[in-house]
């Protein structure tokens, strides 16, 4: 699926799971606008999902934003700028206030996102799946997904129940490398050399 968000429990009274769909990268100008990185595809889809919630902190190994609490924020302006996006947030009217938001994750309620289609997956649904080689070897669990220029990468970390404790980077190539996914069984099957 196009949106690459990671799940995180809603805090502060929100009833829905929040999905990380972007991040504030920097400031734009002197009137409080912020540069935004969107994990959605196309990037401008980020504008559709309101309200936003902001949370300071990097993603932890489980894919959830680890530090801080979610705070709702209203988007009052949004537009493409160069190769990216910029947004104006309610109550943020100068460069200093905008700078205080840099590095914060943008979360939206999961129920705002469209259902994934047949054979499509949100990254948040893949985190935690057990990864099995086509010959049955257990390679570990999906800890995160990484977007690269050529193709996305599944990061698999071995544990005490797997072949070894190595971390593997497996290209997201459905049908070629990723041969099957069963969310119901919590498994992903891959045709990938375990030595890599």
Curated annotation (Swiss-Prot):
Localization of this protein: Cytoplasm
GO MF terms, alphabetically ordered: ribosome binding
UniProt KW keywords: Chaperone, Cytoplasm, Ribosome biogenesis, rRNA processing
Gene3D superfamilies (alphabetical): PRC-barrel domain, RimM
Domain PRC barrel, first and last residues per copy: 118-196
InterPro entries membership: PRC-brl_dom, PRC_barrel-like_sf, RimM, RimM_N, RimM_N_sf, Transl_B-barrel_sf
GO terms under cellular component: cytoplasm; ribosome
GO biological process, alphabetically ordered: ribosomal small subunit biogenesis; rRNA processing
Role, per record: An accessory protein needed during the final step in the assembly of 30S ribosomal subunit, possibly for assembly of the head region. Essential for efficient processing of 16S rRNA. May be needed both before and after RbfA during the maturation of 16S rRNA. It has affinity for free ribosomal 30S subunits but not for 70S ribosomes.
Assembly description: Binds ribosomal protein uS19.
PANTHER family per the UniProt record, alphabetical: RIBOSOME MATURATION FACTOR RIMM (PTHR33692:SF1)
Family designation: Belongs to the RimM family.
Domain remarks in the Swiss-Prot or TrEMBL record: The PRC barrel domain binds ribosomal protein uS19.
HAMAP family: Ribosome_mat_RimM
Protein name: Ribosome maturation factor RimM
The organism of origin for this protein: Alcanivorax borkumensis (strain ATCC 700651 / DSM 11573 / NCIMB 13689 / SK2)
Gene behind this protein: rimM
């Amino acid at each position: 699926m196009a949106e690459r968000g990671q799940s995180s429990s809603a805090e502060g009274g929100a009833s829905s799971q929040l999905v990380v769909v972007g991040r504030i990268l920097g400031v734009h100008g002197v009137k409080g606008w912020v540069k935004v990185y969107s994990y959605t595809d196309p990037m401008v889809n980020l504008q559709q999902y309101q309200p936003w919630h902001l949370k300071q902190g990097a993603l932890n190994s489980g894919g959830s934003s680890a530090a801080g609490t979610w705070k709702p924020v209203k988007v009052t302006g949004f537009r493409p700028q160069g190769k990216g996006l910029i947004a104006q947030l309610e109550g943020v009217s100068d460069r200093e206030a905008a700078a205080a938001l840099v590095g914060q994750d943008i979360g939206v309620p999961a129920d705002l996102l469209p259902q994934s289609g047949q054979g499509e997956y949100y990254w948040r649904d893949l985190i935690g799946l057990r990864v099995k080689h086509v010959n049955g070897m257990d390679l570990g669990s999906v800890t995160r997904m990484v977007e690269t220029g050529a193709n996305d990468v599944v990061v698999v970390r071995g544990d005490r129940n797997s072949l070894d404790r190595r971390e593997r980077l497996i290209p997201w190539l459905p049908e070629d490398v990723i041969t099957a996914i069963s969310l119901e069984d919590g498994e992903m099957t891959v045709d990938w050399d375990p030595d890599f």
